[in-house]
């Protein structure tokens, strides 16, 4: 059996037997999500929870001051940031900002792959957020929220993590980028959907993780997966399908013209979004 097939066989067997170790949410994200679900939580208490993590606090202030909050007056404290963002969006935004903590490894090859994967993910997130911002401005449709958009884009390829964990356990055999690419292409969507269910995330997250590369999956209405696909296409993450993705986006009125993706406005919005994760 080839090394490539061996890795795939081990992964498929563990998926089938429900023995694949799935990543858990970072502790601070779990705390914030639990607090957000408390009907008695207030903005001050939420600020105290987020304040336990200096890195998350700094990024929360950064997003509160970003173009996506649409305010010109800067906030300087976590309490001000939480007040501006609001309890409804805090749950998903804080989870999104904590996700980078999952992309770590002690294995040099796997670590390099994770760093590359995180950078690619941030690019896709930034592009997806920019596309949605332009869509809302053009259509005035506000059924979808930017906080869910951000988190669905950040978790769209989360299925790579257990694959890389398995590779790390067998580093002398499996830590080969070619083998990893094949396993990821075949199994990441299926595993990603399992992670989203394990974390208790909604079906929109499951569908994006499972189907973002599968262009035969076309929801009846425009939804988050449309923006993730365009974001991925602009980032060069959908090999050989960029034209198909963009044509589908035009058909579904996600964008009205490909030219918008080359505009200064798009570049500015994507750049502002990317800075949130810098």
What are these regions (language model features)?
Residues 243-257:
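Short helix/strand-capping connector loops at secondary-structure junctions
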Residues 3-14, 253, 259-278:
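Terminal helices and disordered tails flanking the catalytic cores of nucleotide-processing hydrolases
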Residues 170-171, 277:
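Alpha-helix C-terminal capping segments
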Residues 1-155, 162-169, 175-177, 183, ...:
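Conserved alpha-helical "signature site"
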């Amino acid at each position: 059996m080839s090394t490539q097939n061996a890795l795939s066989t081990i992964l498929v067997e563990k998926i089938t037997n429900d023995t694949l170790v799935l990543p858990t949410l970072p502790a601070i994200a779990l705390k914030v999500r639990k607090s957000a679900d408390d009907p008695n939580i207030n903005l001050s208490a939420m600020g105290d929870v987020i304040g336990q993590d200096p890195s998350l606090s700094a990024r929360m202030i950064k997003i509160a001051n970003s173009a996506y909050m649409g305010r010109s007056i800067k906030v300087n404290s976590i309490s001000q940031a939480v007040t501006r963002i609001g309890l409804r969006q805090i749950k998903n935004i804080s989870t999104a900002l904590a996700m980078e903590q999952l992309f770590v490894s002690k294995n040099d090859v796997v670590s390099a792959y994770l760093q590359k994967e995180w950078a690619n993910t941030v690019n896709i997130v930034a592009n997806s957020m920019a596309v949605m911002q332009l869509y809302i401005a053009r259509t005035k449709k506000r059924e979808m929220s930017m906080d869910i958009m951000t988190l669905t884009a950040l978790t769209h390829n989360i299925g790579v993590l257990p694959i890389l964990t398995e590779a790390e356990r067998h580093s002398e055999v499996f830590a080969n980028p070619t083998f990893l690419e094949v396993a990821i292409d075949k199994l990441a969507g299926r595993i990603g959907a399992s992670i989203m269910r394990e974390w208790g995330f909604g079906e929109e997250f499951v569908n994006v993780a499972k189907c973002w590369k599968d262009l035969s999956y076309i929801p009846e209405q425009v939804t988050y997966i449309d923006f993730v696909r365009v974001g991925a296409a602009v980032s060069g993450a959908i090999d050989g399908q960029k034209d198909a993705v963009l044509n589908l986006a035009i058909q579904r009125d996600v964008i009205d013209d490909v030219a918008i993706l080359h505009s200064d406005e798009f570049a500015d919005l994507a750049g502002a979004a990317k800075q949130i994760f810098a």
